[in-house]
Swiss-Prot record:
Function as written in the Swiss-Prot or TrEMBL entry: Catalyzes the 2-beta-hydroxylation of several biologically active gibberellins, leading to the homeostatic regulation of their endogenous level. Catabolism of gibberellins (GAs) plays a central role in plant development. Converts GA9/GA20 to GA51/GA29 and GA4/GA1 to GA34/GA8.
Record's keyword terms, sorted: Dioxygenase, Iron, Metal-binding, Oxidoreductase
Keyword Iron listed: yes
Top-level taxon of origin: Eukaryota
Pathway(s) this gene product operates in, as recorded in its UniProt entry: Plant hormone biosynthesis; gibberellin biosynthesis
Gene3D superfamilies xref list: B-lactam Antibiotic, Isopenicillin N Synthase, Chain (2.60.120.330)
Organism: Phaseolus coccineus
Swiss-Prot/TrEMBL GO biological process terms: gibberellin biosynthetic process
Ligand binding (Fe cation): H204, D206, H261
Similarity comment: Belongs to the iron/ascorbate-dependent oxidoreductase family. GA2OX subfamily.
Cofactor entry: Fe cation
EC number(s) on file: 1.14.11.13
Gene name linked to the record: GA2OX1
Protein name per its UniProtKB record: Gibberellin 2-beta-dioxygenase
Amino acid sequence: MVVLSQPALNQFFLLKPFKSTPLFTGIPVVDLTHPDAKNLIVNACRDFGFFKLVNHGVPLELMANLENEALRFFKKSQSEKDRAGPPDPFGYGSKRIGPNGDVGWVEYLLLNTNPDVISPKSLCIFRENPHHFRAVVENYITAVKNMCYAVLELMAEGLGIRQRNTLSRLLKDEKSDSCFRLNHYPPCPEVQALNRNLVGFGEHTDPQIISVLRSNSTSGLQICLTDGTWVSVPPDQTSFFINVGDALQVMTNGRFKSVKHRVLADTTKSRLSMIYFGGPALSENIAPLPSVMLKGEECLYKEFTWCEYKKAAYTSRLADNRLAPFQKSAAD
């Protein structure tokens, strides 16, 4: 990604001037080893749709190794990086977010979590030593998946679901439609003189069941609270941040809310984030779980397959309410 002139910057969404948002100190923190972790998770998902996870069991070495490999790729020349794209949907992409006109000050690698798919993509990403990149990615994803299973099983317990694996089995399914994304937000000093904030990734919710984010020490992530206030999330490169996705909102019949979030680019420092998106198989039916609903409680959402929802999501803009077409009305 190159230095931008003022006219070039105009194609990106520049937020209006506002006082810098202080880092929000009220982010829920869940210790995965805490005796009451199941209830802490449920409370955080209900009140915020988001929480910070500590004592997660993923070795810091795996995080550092992947960060180093990602930065090694993003520091390549643009022509070299372009050989790993365009995204189909997997591969390298820059500035364009999806097919419907959304843009951001970001470049990324999007990968399937299936090792058989990672392998051929690795040849395009690092031609000189693809096997090392593949091993680093697979080691990280395996560790994060296992951690994610534990979170979902505690979540099921906290919701009073009798079978602990009700949620985790969807991600353990060999046909699980999960993916992994490396986002790089280069510094953009040209924006500083404009008294604007450059959006790296515009406001949106994640469509999957759950997403697991880890970033370097550069801030930029913001979440929207239930009252509509945007707050900045303090970075912590040793911890993970867990997002409730649209599918989980439906499965809990609205008890959990998929959190709206965005990323603002920094003027002087680059931000690198790595996100695991845990999704079900394409054929999986998504609907409110009877085991979480009270007697006589009405379903807020129509049943749909993950494939149907995914197709609908790809026809929408980033900030759209993608669940709206699947919400039940009084006439249903």
